Amino acid sequence: SEYEKKHFSVEVTEIISPKLERDRNLIFLSDLHNNEFGRDNGELVAAIHRLHPDAVLSGGDMMVCKGKRDIKVPLKLFRQLAASYPVYCGNGNHENRMVWERSLYGDLYEEYRDAMTAMGVHYLEDSFAFLGRDLRIAGLDLALCFYRKALYQKVPLMPPGYLERKLGKGPSDCKEEPFTILLAHSPLYFDSYARWGADLTLAGHFHGGTIRIPGLGGVMTPQYQFFLPWCAGDFERDGKRMIVSRGLGTHSINIRLNNRPQLVLIRLRRA
């Protein structure tokens, strides 16, 4: 509904790990797609301030790159957030599309990334940054093939060693190692992320499944997959966790039904 699209909910997940030296509260944003909650996203920023996070993490798709060249909305939002908090950003397919479709976007990707880094944002392109000694945040750029529309061809499996080639050897379970958060836009490959060693994967991309049906979950993803289990929510594999956000915006299929936009608060607690 139109009402839902403009009224986000704040949802809390707690994660406990012996790898952490201290407790932290993190905000996770995803899939804004140029949506605005109040002027210049004032309502979203105010809600984040009320939660007093230690850092803000973004999982990508903060703009709409479908022939449009508008990056003003996310830049205004991140300028406000970076003035108050450490900010860590990974890419989604819409950020990456500016690279994949150079003929259309020119240097817009570099313009966006450079504006973000000038604000002090940690911009993670197949790279890592730390938040203290005990918390490491990685951003994974997935190749275009992993975002194929399932109507036309099968979505590919992730080849063995893909994450190692992109990000190097994964973390171990040793509690002396930092707790590793992976910003990986698509939740489809959670098995690979967990196998690589990410303690917590943060994903979005599926917009909660567009329409959510009680007992069944999300109906359809932007890749035209139906009733996938991980359209949104909290998942576990062999002690590794994944949080999939319903996102904050929409684009081509501008519908949200029983599927409010979501601001995620993650409470990391030391075991």
Q: Residues of each region from the PLM?
A:
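Binuclear metal-dependent hydrolase catalytic cores centered on His/Asp/Glu-rich metal-binding motifs
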Residues: 99-120, 128, 132-180, 190, ...
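Conserved beta-sheet core of the metallophosphoesterase superfamily
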Residues: 186-264
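Active-site neighborhood of phospho(di)ester-bond hydrolases with catalytic His/Asp-centered motifs
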Residues: 28-30, 55-61, 86-93, 124-126, ...
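Solvent-exposed loop/turn segments at secondary-structure junctions
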Residues: 34, 62-65, 93-97, 143-145, ...
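N-terminal membrane-anchoring alpha-helices
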Residues: 1-20
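Beta-strand-turn-beta hairpins that frame and shape the catalytic cleft
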Residues: 14-27, 121, 128-139, 236-241, ...
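Membrane-embedded segments
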Residues: 19-122
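Active-site-proximal beta-strand elements of phosphoester/diester hydrolases
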Residues: 23-33, 134-146, 181-184, 241-246
